[in-house]
From Swiss-Prot:
Domain of life: Eukaryota
Free-text note regarding domains: The PH domain of FAPPS binds the small GTPase ARF1 and phosphatidylinositol-4-phosphate (PtdIns4P) with high selectivity, and is required for recruitment of FAPPs to the trans-Golgi network (TGN).
Biological role stated in the UniProt entry: Cargo transport protein that is required for apical transport from the trans-Golgi network (TGN). Transports AQP2 from the trans-Golgi network (TGN) to sites of AQP2 phosphorylation. Mediates the non-vesicular transport of glucosylceramide (GlcCer) from the trans-Golgi network (TGN) to the plasma membrane and plays a pivotal role in the synthesis of complex glycosphingolipids. Binding of both phosphatidylinositol 4-phosphate (PIP) and ARF1 are essential for the GlcCer transfer ability.
Region feature Glycolipid transfer protein homology domain, mapped onto this chain: 310-519
Subcellular locations according to the entry: Golgi apparatus, trans-Golgi network membrane; Membrane
Protein name: Pleckstrin homology domain-containing family A member 8
Bias (Low complexity) ranges: 282-298
Length: 519
């Protein structure tokens, strides 16, 4: 549905006509239909907002996300408001029903997996008992050979049952958790790093003419270019020739969009052109030096040698780009973005079998980020987050940011260990993974988790397939210059990663935050 509604802006401009479009469960608005190519000035997700009918004005309705977003709207007539209410309510109901069904299926699959995991623990205990029994029979000598045969048969049967149950666990996980629930970037997390033609702090999407603009609009869900940002934010910055997308921008809503309470919004905030803007913005647009192409980076020659880009040289955010702050402070935002940028390595190892590892890594990033966005001004470094929780005596509470960061750095150590093995010339991916796991995560895992990892190792790709997945241009891995490029990029990436992990290790050791808990 689309049409004109009056939107409350501020006490200076009052109610102003805006063109609204309801599409795909998102209500977005523009100055006019003719200005739609510029991108929407604001939008609201119907699935999470409340629809309130005004008690006095029979043409007014309010769309509210408590504590975040407020749309105060008026229709031109009672009948028109009723049509909008029906359309908005239907969109909200459809989205809610769909989401409820997905959540129900997810919960059922989770319960099934928990049941199988309980069975695994039972068989694990039986295995331990039967191994002890086998040892006792062995120490008695060969006189009681029949008993030894019986114990051996029983142990073999238990092992087979254990492996069968473990495979069933993996089948449930593969069937249930390979949907968008697993692979999409979770809300409240930094945008997953994408391969760019060059490292840029602020990605640029050039739009040179009205035809290209229209093509971009046709590909968008709600008629505007947008990208996911922390806390579900979508921030669209406009310019005459380009749209600049900048993640992690904290703004106060402009004066035209303010109510008398001067509400600060962490959701979408759009700066309206041609109107009074008396609000203060915390961040400003970064102007690009020149237009960039969105095509993959090409290899080039320097001093007679071919330079081939790799996954690590084209990462949007890298540990090697992080500049430490005062007292070796690790900037929170840059660190979390760098963590997200390395997550695709797990997809290249196997998006299904390594899904549990990826889910754990992403979950811990999200937990730390949720703490960060509660007070971005204070939690500028990881150390400040940890020390804040230490002082509040919640650092070792379950699901705290400190605990999440503990497991996050352990997961990063595993990835660093694996990449170090590859850099040092290990051609067997299974061996590289097993060595890295043995040095990092294995000591923190119990029998069941170790068994799951052992099963995942069987599906690890060959060295050739893994290296091919790290190329930007197909076939580059067959060139000798690509191996040189991998060595070059990892020689920059791994030491920077190791330095920051060492700083975190020291922080946790000084405050006694390391844990021997086994999962």
């Amino acid at each position: 549905m689309e049409g004109v509604l009056y939107k409350w802006t501020n006490y200076l401009s009052g109610w102003q006509p805006r063109w609204f479009l309801l599409c795909g469960g998102i209500l977005s608005y523009y100055d006019s239909p003719e200005d739609a190519w510029k991108g929407c000035k604001g939008s609201i997700q119907m699935a999470v907002c409340e629809i309130q009918v005004h008690s006095v004005d029979n043409t007014r309705m309010d769309l509210i996300i408590p504590g975040e977003q407020y749309f105060y709207l008026k229709a031109r007539s009672v009948a028109e408001r009723q049509r909008w209410l029906v359309a908005l309510g239907s969109a909200k109901a459809c989205l809610t029903d769909s989401r409820t069904q997905k959540e129900k299926e997810f919960a059922e699959n989770t319960e099934n997996l928990k049941t199988k995991m309980s069975e695994l623990r039972l068989y694990c205990d039986l295995l331990v008992q039967q191994v002890d029994k086998t040892k006792e029979v062995t120490t008695t000598g060969v006189s009681n050979s029949e008993e030894g045969i019986d114990v051996g048969t029983l142990l073999k049967s238990t092992c087979n049952t254990f492996l069968k149950t473990l495979e069933e666990c993996m089948q449930i996980a593969n069937a249930a958790f390979t949907s968008e629930l697993l692979y999409r970037t979770p809300p409240g997390s930094p945008q997953l790093a994408m391969l760019k033609s060059s490292k840029m702090k602020h990605p640029i999407i050039p739009i040179h003419n009205s035809l290209e603009r229209q093509m971009e609009l046709n590909s968008c869900e709600n008629g505007s270019l947008h990208m996911e940002i922390n806390d579900g934010e979508e921030i669209l910055m406009k310019n005459k020739s380009s749209l600049y997308l900048k993640p992690e921008i904290d703004c106060s809503i402009s004066s035209e969009e303010n109510t008398d309470d001067n509400i600060t919004v962490q959701g979408e905030i759009m700066k309206e052109e041609g109107e009074d803007n008396l609000g203060n913005h915390d961040s400003s647009l970064a102007q690009p030096a020149s237009d960039s192409s969105s095509s993959p980076p090409e290899s080039h020659w320097e001093e007679g040698q071919e330079i081939i880009p790799t996954f690590f040289s084209t990462m949007n955010t890298s540990f090697s780009d992080i500049e430490l702050l005062e007292d070796s402070g690790i900037p929170t935002e840059a660190f979390l973005a760098s963590c997200y940028a390395v997550v695709p390595v797990l997809d290249k190892l196997g998006p299904t079998v390594f899904a549990p590892v990826k889910m754990d890594l992403v979950g811990n990033i999200k937990k730390v980020n949720q703490k960060y966005i509660t007070n971005k001004e204070e939690f500028t470094t990881l150390q400040k987050i940890v020390l804040h929780e230490v002082e509040a005596d919640v650092a070792q509470v379950r699901n705290s940011a400190t605990e999440a960061l503990l497991w996050l750095k352990r997961g990063l150590k595993f990835l660093k260990g694996f990449l170090t093995e590859v850099k040092n010339g290990e051609k067997d991916i299974q061996t590289a993974l097993n060595n890295a796991y043995g040095k990092t995560l294995r000591q923190h895992h119990g029998w069941v988790v170790r068994g799951v990892f052992a099963l995942a190792l069987r599906a690890a790709p060959s060295y050739e397939d893994f290296v091919a997945a790290l190329t930007i241009k197909e076939g580059d891995h067959q060139k000798a210059a690509f191996s040189v490029g991998m060595q070059r990029d990892l020689s920059l990436y791994l030491p920077a990663m190791e330095k920051q992990l060492a700083i975190l290790d020291t922080l946790y050791e000084v405050h006694g935050l390391e844990s021997d808990e086994v999962v």
